[in-house]
């Protein structure tokens, strides 16, 4: 997993003060990272347009232009007059080696290009973009688009101006910034990469409590013993609500992810031999012996024995439970909560936090972190375009999910994966992380995003 920071200022300061690297060296390395992205996506001689702002982000752009001129048809547009000392210096250096620099007002030529590089605002963006920064029309003329550090129009909280630069790849300088991982930013950053600034990243980084999950972090269930039986791999119990299909999907998902036994219990529906999958065990009552249980999928009302069940085994709580105040009984237990934003708002209201959906979406990371600090036994998995998993103030971000998962039943499959890992003795945090990764990666395996069904998803999970 990768370390994530709200801002890179403290990291850069450490490089300058402790290791005596200069701003010049940092900027040269930033330009080298951008240069690699250009070389990977364009042939020599291709046309490259670089948009430069007034600060150090613009300085990165002028440095890039100096490195490209002679190999590419390089054109720089000065979107704002160079103001920072490094930006002014790099602009002069670029001019000395023959880089063509024009004011934006001089754009009287064909703006079509092979590569368009955004070095306008970066991390300095606040408020709204100036009217003349028409990235949308410019982007339509470029075959490939690169953003330096942060696409212009995304602020430090991940809020996005509707006219923001939409990149095919974003090179985050030094380390990944949390603003690049907001739900709203997901459509603007493209592929996310880190540009190293002259120091190995593990030396460059400082301690953080925010992390980006990677494919390599996934630890699938392991059956490495030959002398074993079903009891060695746990008993997961799934309680079915009024909409029984949701719980059945969870149960099938749990069975496909390694649980030795998966049982179901009908709370608000009827299950018969005709509509129960043969591989699931039917229980009329809550089992006396079990490893973990899942409740909430398709549920309308909280069962009267809910509090008693919480004492018997670790659990996953999903969907319908968050609309009932009885869920507060679970907040002092080791449980995994898996709400989507609307359900989380209902839960927050129950604990006395009244905010709007807009406030939640604009401050999702901070709110999830604060909630996990207030309820340290709980693991919160907050769904969204990027999933947040929060525990005791640490937040793990899964940005691997795709639009293929935007289907009814997808979340039920996820609940089943989590309860399966819980039943196999994963810690609640590890269960949430690994289930989330498996869920996302299985979604990426499906070719047509529009066609994925929950049962397809389970089949893909079996093949990870």
UniProtKB/Swiss-Prot annotation:
Binding site for (6S)-NADPHX 2: 298, 412
Gene that encodes the chain: nnr
The protein's name in its UniProt record: Bifunctional NAD(P)H-hydrate repair enzyme Nnr
Domain YjeF C-terminal residues, every copy: 213-464
EC number: 4.2.1.136, 5.1.99.6
Organism: Helicobacter pylori (strain J99 / ATCC 700824)
Biological processes annotated in GO: metabolite repair; nicotinamide nucleotide metabolic process
Similarity comment: In the N-terminal section; belongs to the NnrE/AIBP family.
Database matches in NCBIfam families: yjeF_cterm (TIGR00196), yjeF_nterm (TIGR00197)
UniProt entry keywords in alphabetical sequence: ATP-binding, Isomerase, Lyase, Metal-binding, Multifunctional enzyme, NAD, NADP, Nucleotide-binding, Potassium
Residues the record lists as binding ADP: 383-387, 402-411
Keyword NADP: yes
YjeF N-terminal domain segment(s): 8-205
Catalytic activity: (6S)-NADHX + ADP = AMP + phosphate + NADH + H(+); (6S)-NADPHX + ADP = AMP + phosphate + NADPH + H(+); (6R)-NADHX = (6S)-NADHX; (6R)-NADPHX = (6S)-NADPHX
Annotated positions binding K(+): 57, 118, 152
Cofactor names: K(+)
Keyword Membrane set for record: no
Function: Bifunctional enzyme that catalyzes the epimerization of the S- and R-forms of NAD(P)HX and the dehydration of the S-form of NAD(P)HX at the expense of ADP, which is converted to AMP. This allows the repair of both epimers of NAD(P)HX, a damaged form of NAD(P)H that is a result of enzymatic or heat-dependent hydration.
